[in-house]
Regions:
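Residue-level signal for alpha-helical context at structural boundaries
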Residues: 23, 62, 341, 348, ...
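Single conserved hydrophobic/aromatic residue that forms the stacking wall/gate
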Residues: 415-426
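Structured, solvent-exposed acidic/aromatic patches
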Residues: 1-333, 379-381
Length: 426
């Protein structure tokens, strides 16, 4: 039931209305009944409510549990119960946005209170050992990760050159996410991305006396000379920037003396050639890569959000820690999850990261996107800190990032409306 609840939560969050009541049933006349997203989520909460209540560590177990195995390989029922209750909390929080459906928000409110009552609070994730995470297999022809099948397999088989690592297919940190990592000197950066390097050195032996960092050639304004000057400098991480230098909708500049000649400002780009991007570490896409579905860090950020919004939502819960404490717990849980041991205390003291502070961030190379964190000035600003840290903690989990952004719009993702279909691209 818990696994079915999770799968349906992904289906309805991704596509909206989906068949539930009529799933796997014979239909006539090509008529198919879809349940609304609210209906699906309400049923999911009912399933999870029942699951949390009936899980019995002393009862029957799956002998070979691939998801939450105990010491002998059998199901760890306590971990399954923690997953069910933590998932219930996550889905109920999402449903509080369904203000046009009072029945859905009423049930969500009830389930948040039930998930956090004195008994069920014990059935939330309390360490990274509780994280809901699946793992792919090692058979290249059957159960390896999709990224391995599409990307790494070609390198391992020798059908693709190692110097193509910087290509468009290999996942890398994008410029907008990197703005936050760089602006606030996030110690998770080295865990989230590999350092950029000269393509000619990929797979080769490094020489300690040489500098392999990417070289950037750029035009910067000289306050002394009062003009733009050409400069070159090295950077350890080269984020993947949007390949389209002139975005859709950009009014291209023209030279005022020649209508056929574009001006210097027709595109916004810098010259970076022959270097790999800040590629994701191999562990994220290897054959038996781990796929994290829900984590301890996320649970802490949920609790922080609830502490901030319980009056707004009319929720009667008494949690043992403050929103600020849960916020810091979430950051520390994420650091622990990725094995970060240094730079954490300094990070937590930086403006924008420290609770109830504002932090100014850098912008992308076209000056479209700025990585500020405005956490000062009341609970709505505190929420921005909580949501953005949750987004950072779910790196390389596209579903988690999409779900949070869809609900909060906190990352202010660049959105383009495609005509004439009015298709929204984020």
């Amino acid at each position: 039931t818990t696994w079915k609840a999770y799968l349906y939560s992904v289906l309805t969050t991704t596509w909206g209305p989906v068949p539930m009541d009529a799933a796997c049933k014979e239909t006539y006349g090509n008529v198919y009944y879809y349940n609304s997203e609210a209906e699906v989520n309400m049923q999911i909460l009912r399933w999870l409510d029942t699951a949390v209540d009936i899980f019995d560590p002393e009862g029957e177990k799956m002998l070979k549990d691939p998801f939450y195995p105990g010491t002998g390989g059998e199901s760890d029922i306590e971990k399954w119960r923690k997953f069910a209750n933590s998932l219930r909390l996550d889905i109920a929080i999402r449903m509080m946005n369904m203000k046009k459906n009072p029945e859905a928000t009423t049930l969500a409110r009830e389930q948040i209170e039930k998930a956090l009552n004195p008994t069920n609070r014990n059935y939330l994730f309390t360490s990274n050992d509780d994280n809901a995470a699946g793992r792919y297999g090692t058979d290249p022809n059957a159960d390896v990760s999709l990224y391995y099948e599409r990307i790494l397999k070609e390198f391992d088989l020798g059908t693709k050159l190692e110097t193509e690592l910087g290509g468009l297919t290999y996942p890398a940190m994008n410029e907008y996410f990197f703005c936050y990592m760089r602006s606030f000197q996030d110690p998770r950066l080295s865990k989230y991305a590999q350092q950029s390097r000269n393509n000619n050195t990929v797979g080769a032996k490094y020489e300690s006396e040489k500098d392999y960092r990417a070289v950037v050639r750029d035009s910067l304004w000289s306050t002394k000379e009062k003009r733009f000057v050409q400069v070159s400098y090295r950077i350890p991480y080269l984020p993947r920037f949007e390949m389209k230098q002139t975005p859709s909708g950009w009014l291209t500049g023209k030279d005022e003396h020649n209508n056929d000649l574009q001006s210097l400002y027709s595109t916004a780009s810098v010259s970076i050639e022959g270097y790999t991007y800040a590629l994701v570490p191999r562990d994220f896409i290897k054959q038996d890569a781990t796929i994290k579905l829900l984590t301890w860090a996320e649970v802490n950020f949920m609790l922080s959000e609830i502490q901030l919004r319980k009056e707004e939502w009319g929720i009667n819960v008494a949690l043992p820690q403050s929103a600020e404490q849960y916020y810091y717990n979430g950051i520390n849980a994420s650091m622990n999850e990725y094995g970060v041991t240094t730079g954490i205390s300094e990070y937590l003291e930086r403006d924008g990261i420290k609770w109830n502070t504002n932090g100014l961030g850098c912008h992308d190379y076209r000056n479209f996107y700025k990585a500020d964190i405005n956490g000062k000035g009341g609970y709505k600003n505190n929420l921005q800190q909580v949501w953005k840290q949750r987004y950072f903690a779910t790196y390389f989990n596209g579903y988690a990032g999409w779900t949070l952004e869809r609900r909060t719009r906190v990352m202010l993702s660049l959105i383009h409306i495609s005509e004439p279909t009015r298709r929204v691209v984020i």
